[in-house]
Curated annotation (Swiss-Prot):
GO terms for cellular component: nucleus. This is Transcription activator of gluconeogenesis CPC735_053490. Residues 77-105 bind DNA. The lineage of its organism: Eukaryota, Fungi, Dikarya, Ascomycota, Pezizomycotina. PANTHER family: TRANSCRIPTION ACTIVATOR OF GLUCONEOGENESIS ERT1, ZN(II)2CYS6 TRANSCRIPTION FACTOR (EUROFUNG)-RELATED. InterPro entries: ERT1_acuK_gluconeogen_tf, PAS_13, Zn2-C6_fun-type_DNA-bd_sf, Zn2Cys6_DnaBD. Transcription factor which regulates nonfermentable carbon utilization. Activator of gluconeogenetic genes. GO terms for molecular function: DNA-binding transcription factor activity, RNA polymerase II-specific; RNA polymerase II transcription regulatory region sequence-specific DNA binding; zinc ion binding. The keyword Transferase does not apply. Belongs to the ERT1/acuK family. Residues 160-171, 213-229 have a biased composition (Low complexity). It comes from the Eukaryota. One of its GO terms (biological process) is gluconeogenesis. It is found in: Nucleus.
Length: 713
């Protein structure tokens, strides 16, 4: 294509000289269209002007310093990009219009950097993709016909044409409608539940709902047909998921070196604060549709009803559905979804398309529950009388709003500050004293054969303990105890939140933390396990009789009071006191293999936990010496877990069989805490499967043992 074909016929220029062709190489084709054509190139490029005349500087001259500067486009179109010419921000650009290819004018594709190879193309510069869509949307909007009594009328879906769709949500029309279109195919309380999962961004802009402002009730059914034509024109124009403005992202405030990283970070934050809080009703909340189970999650600022299943959508600004809606809405069930329909729920939730989460995630009130909607008092009893409602009474019911989420009562919980750990720990923990107490307990309780097996297991890891601790000074030992207390501080929250019976003990076997479920299962109180109350247990799981307290080495004397170590601290209960003989031996043999072995390893096996039984419990169950006063004393010293469920003391001569018949089991096998207490009621042992692992400190020394138990039912 020649220059004459592009710019028209060449006009004769009397001042044109051969010197006029000495122009810079970067003169654009747009500049060539505004300046006079010069003589053919290659003729006397170095000749001087004749008769001393000089060519006047025009505004289009590339060397003119006063010429208007052309603003560089943020992204050139494909044609200008291939031609290496200056393009404009408008689409189609002026160069493509002159060439007659305005229909093919679209943004060019830039070469991505290496660190953006995995990024989708639409996510690199999303805020520049609205120009093409806006032009197409404006064209489609002006060509949508709406038939009303045989006449065509244009509906103003939006108050004004926007140069960019980012400002759409700032100019939303008023949600109240004079006369909306309602269908008799369904009632508002039986809306189909929309699936939040959406592989594509299929937000439906319903002009049949939003374009009915100011129209009478006799609006023809052709609105629904026009809505189907308008969906293609507005679906991608005003709801582009790659635009950060739709999600209220302020990318400039994010301290990221690249645009894609900031967009990804903002998207994750949006998912955590929006879709993560109320996944079942999040998609319905933002656009005024009704979620599953009739939950009244809706907003007043939305004019777009969604009907994924093809059924008509309803707008909640409608004054005619207030009476039926208020009687059927269940405000207490907004977040309690129907568990019977869980199989129909999707496995993921789509990200919302509108910037609804303007509030900070740290705010007390959920941002999804801030909008309210008022309904009218005097409404039509049936939908057949909707056409006669032309005026809305001024009397209104109280404002109906969705209830707030029940937050945890943090004020009632004790304030925990990990800084107090570093201030309170002043002395190292005496593990030597703990091992001496453990050795004395093992020799006092176990038989020589079992004692020898435990001693061999501990002797195999003794050199490793000596090698790892010989270079540690006092400051290191204090720091080791601070690490232990800090780790235990983290485990306490986990134990309280987890429903599995859990205990945490030191490497000496001393109990350091215990969960409520473990106390319910075994009857051991937390204060007794931690050494804060006397340990009156006499149940050692001996073989000479059920709960006789007699082992192969003879009777085991319980602690009559709280044992005080030479260091001044109380003596917690050892792990060996909670297990029967065989389970203790197997534990220490496994501990010898795992203590300095696999740091991430764990052991899963079976054991038998010993129930907490005092002498008063033994006498009551055996039927020898029992009285009401003794039972009251037992209730103060122990847990009272073996009392009958009726709360009355057992009479003399009452057998174990009669107590066993008082157990009440549910269909699941256990009736609450009472059923958990009945486990191991007969022989004082609870057969469990348990898993435990060893956590090490910064010096690679076994620091604590975490154990989880599950009873075998």
């Amino acid at each position: 294509m020649t220059a004459n074909a592009i710019n028209g016929p060449v006009l004769p220029t009397p001042l044109a000289t051969p010197g006029d062709n000495n122009k810079s190489a970067d003169t654009t084709m747009a500049d060539q269209g505004t300046r006079p054509e010069s003589q053919p190139q290659g003729q006397n490029n170095g000749a001087k002007p004749q008769n001393g005349q000089t060519k006047p500087m025009s505004a289009a001259n590339a060397k003119d310093p006063l010429r208007p500067r052309r603003k560089k486009a943020k992204r050139a179109c494909f044609a200008c990009q291939r031609a290496h010419l200056t393009c404009g921000d408008e689409r189609p650009c002026q160069r493509c219009i002159k060439r007659g290819i305005q229909n093919a004018c679209h943004d060019g594709v830039r070469k991505k950097a290496k660190y953006l190879h995995d990024a989708p193309n639409e996510a690199l510069m999303p805020h520049l993709q609205g120009h093409l869509y806006t032009t197409q949307a404006n064209t489609a909007r002006n060509t949508i016909p709406l038939t009303r009594n045989g006449s065509n009328s244009k509906t103003n879906f939006y108050p004004q044409q926007q140069s960019s769709f980012n400002n759409f949500y700032q100019n939303k029309p008023d949600p109240t409608l004079n006369q909306p279109q309602l269908h008799d195919t369904g009632r508002p309380d039986t809306f189909p539940s929309q699936s939040p999962v959406s592989p594509t961004f299929n937000m439906t802009a319903n002009p049949a709902a939003s374009g009915n402002q100011g129209l009478p009730s006799s609006l023809s059914a052709s609105n629904s047909n026009a809505s189907g034509q308008a969906q293609n024109g507005f679906g991608s124009a005003f709801f582009d998921p790659s635009d950060p403005a739709l999600f209220n992202f302020d990318l400039a405030s994010m301290n990221f070196g690249n645009h894609y990283g900031a967009l990804e970070f903002g998207m994750l934050g949006h998912m955590a604060t929006g879709a993560g809080e109320t996944p079942p009703s999040d998609g319905a909340t933002q656009h005024g549709s009704v979620g599953r189970s009739g939950s009244g999650t809706y907003t007043a600022g939305s004019n777009f009803g969604e009907s994924p299943t093809g059924q008509p959508s309803f707008l909640f600004g409608d004054p005619t559905i207030g009476g039926d809606w208020t009687s059927s809405v269940n405000t207490r069930n907004i977040y309690g979804q129907n568990m019977n329909n869980m199989s129909e729920t999707p496995h993921a939730f789509a990200i919302e398309s509108a910037p609804a989460n303007f509030a900070s995630p740290n705010s007390i009130e959920s941002p999804l529950l801030t909008n309210t909607t008022t309904f009218d008092d005097n409404t039509a009893p049936t939908y057949a009388n909707r056409a006669n409602i032309n005026s809305v009474p001024s009397q209104r019911q109280p404002v109906v709003s969705t209830p707030q989420l029940k937050h945890l009562q943090v004020g009632k919980r004790r304030q925990r500050n990990p800084s107090a750990i570093y201030d309170s720990v002043k002395e190292p923990y005496s593990y030597t004293t703990g091992f001496h107490s453990l050795t004395a307990f093992i020799q006092r309780r176990f038989s020589p054969q079992n004692t020898l097996r435990i001693a061999k297991a501990l002797a195999s890891i003794r050199p490793s303990f000596i090698a790892t601790t010989k270079t540690l000074n006092r400051d290191d030992l204090i720091f080791m105890e601070k690490c232990f207390q800090r780790t235990l501080w983290e485990y306490e929250d986990f134990i309280n939140a987890c429903g599995t019976p859990t205990i945490v003990c030191r490497r000496t076997g001393e109990i350091a933390a215990v969960g409520k479920e473990f106390s319910i299962l075994t009857g051991w109180k937390k204060e007794v396990l931690l050494g804060k109350e006397p340990n009156l247990n006499i149940n050692t799981g001996g073989s000479s009789g059920a709960m006789s307290g007699v082992t192969s080495r003879g009777s085991f004397t319980p602690r009559t009071g709280m044992d005080i170590n030479p260091t001044g601290r109380t003596q917690p209960v050892f792990l060996a006191e909670l297990l029967d003989d065989e389970s203790v031996v197997e534990f220490y043999e496994d501990f010898a293999k795992l203590a300095f072995g696999d740091s991430r390893g764990s052991v899963m096996t079976t054991c038998k936990l010993l129930k907490y039984k005092t002498k008063a419990d033994m006498d009551m169950l055996s039927g020898t010496t029992s009285s009401a006063g003794g039972e009251n004393e037992h209730g103060a010293a122990g847990n009272g877990d073996v009392k009958p469920e009726n709360g009355m003391g057992a009479s003399n001569g009452q057998s174990q069989h009669s107590l066993q018949r008082q157990r009440k089991w549910s269909r699941g096998g256990i009736a609450g805490e009472a059923g958990m207490n009945q486990l191991g009621f007969k022989d004082g042992k609870v057969e469990c499967s348990y898993c435990w692992t060893v956590k090490r400190d910064v010096f690679d020394i076994p620091m604590l043992i975490v154990m989880n138990f599950l009873p075998c039912i």
